[in-house]
Amino acid sequence: MGHFTFIGLCLLAMFLSLSGAECYTCPIDWLPKNGLCYKVFSNPKSWLDAEMFCRKFKPGCHLASIHRDADSADLAEYVSDYLKDDGNVWIGLNDPQKKRTWVWSDRSSSNYFSWNQGEPNNSKNKEYCVHLWAPTGYLKWNDAPCETLHPFICQCKY
């Protein structure tokens, strides 16, 4: 009886220690970060096609949204390692109403921005989607025409 009591207490202790822990598993070759999983895709797509591609993984998947400097730095490092500064990368920020009101495709709050100097500039009045800008090591953002083909980064909650 003592052996079963010991095992039971061990299982209870393990359960209690994990009950508040975040538990998720990202697919192989996805980056786990703050309860989300991120993956860079190097096959260039328009912003809308990239967003639709991300959504096909499972409900709640979108182009990546970035809300803090620390997350921006981590994703920039991940993208740099993956692409080796080979092209800009779509993220989920866009201006669907074309009124310079930026929103994330996952509808999360948009109170953090990391624009490159002079951006967003809406060059030729046709830049309504946002990419991580390769010349800045993917740390800064640039608005661009949504039809432009770029690699992209998806985020999913698993």
UniProtKB/Swiss-Prot annotation:
A motif (Mannose-binding) lies at residues 119-121. SMART domains: CLECT. Glycans are attached at N121. The keyword Disulfide bond applies. Keywords: Calcium, Disulfide bond, Glycoprotein, Lectin, Metal-binding, Secreted, Signal. CDD domains: CLECT_REG-1_like. Pfam families: Lectin_C. SUPFAM superfamilies: C-type lectin-like. This is C-type lectin BfL-2. Ca(2+) binds at E127, N142, D143. Residues 1-21 form the signal peptide. InterPro entries: C-type_lectin-like, C-type_lectin-like/link_sf, C-type_lectin/snaclec_domain, C-type_lectin_CS, CTDL_fold. Disulfide bonds join C26-C37, C54-C154, C61-C156, C129-C146. The keyword Magnesium does not apply. Expressed by the venom gland. GO terms for cellular component: extracellular region. Residues 33-155 form the C-type lectin domain. PANTHER family: MANNOSE, PHOSPHOLIPASE, LECTIN RECEPTOR RELATED. GO terms for molecular function: carbohydrate binding; metal ion binding. It is found in: Secreted. It comes from Bungarus fasciatus (Banded krait). Homodimer; non-covalently linked. Belongs to the true venom lectin family.
